[in-house]
Amino acid sequence: MKALSVDQNGKLEVCDVPKPVYGDCQALVKTLSCGVCNGTDMKLIHGSFKNMTHYPMLLGHEAVGQVVEKGKYVTSFEIGDIVLLPFLYGDVGKYSSGWGAYAEYGIVGDAKAYISHGMGPGTKEFDDSFYAQTVIKPEYGLTAVEASMIVTFREVLSAIRRFGFQANQD
């Protein structure tokens, strides 16, 4: 499959990588849209993202996709669901992971399935991103491009809460 990589000099390249293999608690997702993150993606391209120094690297994290296959324990996602944040976990051949969502396919993890099978938080199998990988319900009426903006909105809302802003405050 095709993915977008960056080298240590900031050169972008469309590359071929293997289609990800999903596990029993994961689903395979076909990418529909992926936004450009001014923070993460741009820092990875310019080599300034803290502790991310192994290049070449697969880029992208603000993705939306459609579930096309799922593992036998997955209950939070159904085939055809539109989901947030499919990633490529771990290294893919010579490429390290900058989350890798600028790829044709990614993986989402079913947090409930992991937890119910003894692989919850604190285990090597679990990733905290599984909590954020959620279904975009059809009744929301969002296109895939619009849905990818939810990632940015979540980050903004998190910052507002972290700084303690309240309603009706200047």
Task: Set out the residue ranges of the language-model regions.
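Short polar catalytic/cofactor-binding loops
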Residues: 7-10, 34-36
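Short glycine/threonine/proline-enriched tight-turn/helix- or strand-capping micro-motif at secondary-structure
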Residues: 10-18
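Glycine-rich beta-strand-centered segment in the early N-terminal region that forms part
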Residues: 19-35, 48-102, 109-112
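NAD(P)H dinucleotide-binding glycine-rich loop of Rossmann-like/cofactor-binding domains
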Residues: 90-169
